[in-house]
Amino acid sequence: MKKKILMGTMAICYGAMQAVACTGISLTAKDGSYIQARTIEAAAGALKSEYVIIPRGEEITSFTPSGVNGVTFTARHGVVGMSVVMKEFICEGVNEAGLSAGLFFFPHYGSYQSYDKSMNGISLGDLQVPTWILTQFATIDEVKEGIKNVRIVGLDASSVVHYRIGEPSGRQVVLEIVDGVPHFYENTVGVLTNAPGFEWHLTNLNNYVNLFPGSAPNQRMGDTTLMPIGGNSGFLGLPGDATPPSRFVRIAFYRATAPQLASAMPTVLQCFHILNNFDIPIGIEHSLGEAPDIPSATQWTSAIDLTHRKVYFKTSYNNSIRCIDLATIDFEKVKYQSHLMDPVKEQPIEQIMIK
């Protein structure tokens, strides 16, 4: 009975994730502080997002398609993460070493190894890969070695994700699993969205080689002078829809033209400011025939300071930025815990009193 309840819950969870849109960016400050930020959306349901604290020494067993019987691992590093749907599914987080890992929906293009019940002992559910990475490793190179010892399996055949992994040095890789084979790509453009594959997105950027920041110069056409109608005409043709290819191009150009700021905190705020342009409003993204509601919009935005081990987030219900500083947590003593990002779904409003 417990197994049926669990698998039913997981089926509902995956249903809620069937149209997740995510946009990610990374920026480095002049003092070397490295920030990774992202949005998350889900058109099919509320994500019941929580922030999760994992202490050192916590034992975790992965889900498989047949239950909670996959690979078991013990946390070597304390973790602060943000989960979707279930607290076990951390989709973005950072550990004490400053290693960050997150997942982005990747439908139709990725494919895991087929599930083999006889290999449960080394099977790792796809939505728990970030948790496994964050609790086990301190560097990207360690992840690349460690992944050889597990089989990443999908908990639902219709859902596939790819991963963004970063370290305080500013190095970032994208991990995509195709035909059961892990592929790591060095991410020097510093952005990520969803499908198609990462290499396809890089190739697609070549279609926009004509774009540049600022305004285009006046041009003569015979006896007529053509001039820009407004500012930013150099970006005329930059795609503005919410599809993953368009978001990838747009965030890549916004990152490339963003001024480098002095230190971590201004850069964190800059990430939030840039990602405001990728807030999906209620009504444009939802399942066919369903009334638009808050789940169809951007549900939360996060920024992680890998250098100083700080997690920042704001939500669709509360745009006030909140912060968790890993330096204030004793990961030897703290208990495993999770808390709703929005215990109260209400936006605080500061009243200005006029005298």
Where are these regions (language model features)?
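C-terminus-biased signal that marks the final domain/tail of proteins
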Residues: 20-35, 43, 49, 155-159, ...
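Acidic, His- and aromatic-enriched active-site or binding-groove loops in soluble protein domains
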Residues: 181-193
